[in-house]
Amino acid sequence: MAAKIKKGALVRVVKEKLENSLEAKASDSRFPSYLFDSKGEIIEMNDEYALIRFYVPTPSVWLRLDQLEAVE
């Protein structure tokens, strides 16, 4: 799945993978609905993480690549 994901791609957050992650356990696990109900665009990447911009007035967020799926 991560092989298809590249900078500029539209992605959706996989709820099950984010909710059960170490990151979720280390912070507030009440995620806003836009994370799962809308598409985001990858604006930056490194080996394991992608910076996602959602089209709502909120800051961009870094998420692990395995927590994302490409959308058309």
Curated annotation (Swiss-Prot):
InterPro entries assigned to the protein according to its UniProt record, in alphabetical order: NdhO (IPR020905)
Gene Ontology CC entries for this record: plasma membrane-derived thylakoid membrane
Sorted UniProt keywords: Membrane, NAD, NADP, Plastoquinone, Quinone, Thylakoid, Translocase, Transport
A molecular function (GO) term: oxidoreductase activity, acting on NAD(P)H, quinone or similar compound as acceptor
Pfam name, any one: NdhO
Subcellular location as annotated: Cellular thylakoid membrane
Subunit organization: NDH-1 can be composed of about 15 different subunits; different subcomplexes with different compositions have been identified which probably have different functions.
Function: NDH-1 shuttles electrons from an unknown electron donor, via FMN and iron-sulfur (Fe-S) centers, to quinones in the respiratory and/or the photosynthetic chain. The immediate electron acceptor for the enzyme in this species is believed to be plastoquinone. Couples the redox reaction to proton translocation, and thus conserves the redox energy in a proton gradient. Cyanobacterial NDH-1 also plays a role in inorganic carbon-concentration.
Protein name: NAD(P)H-quinone oxidoreductase subunit O
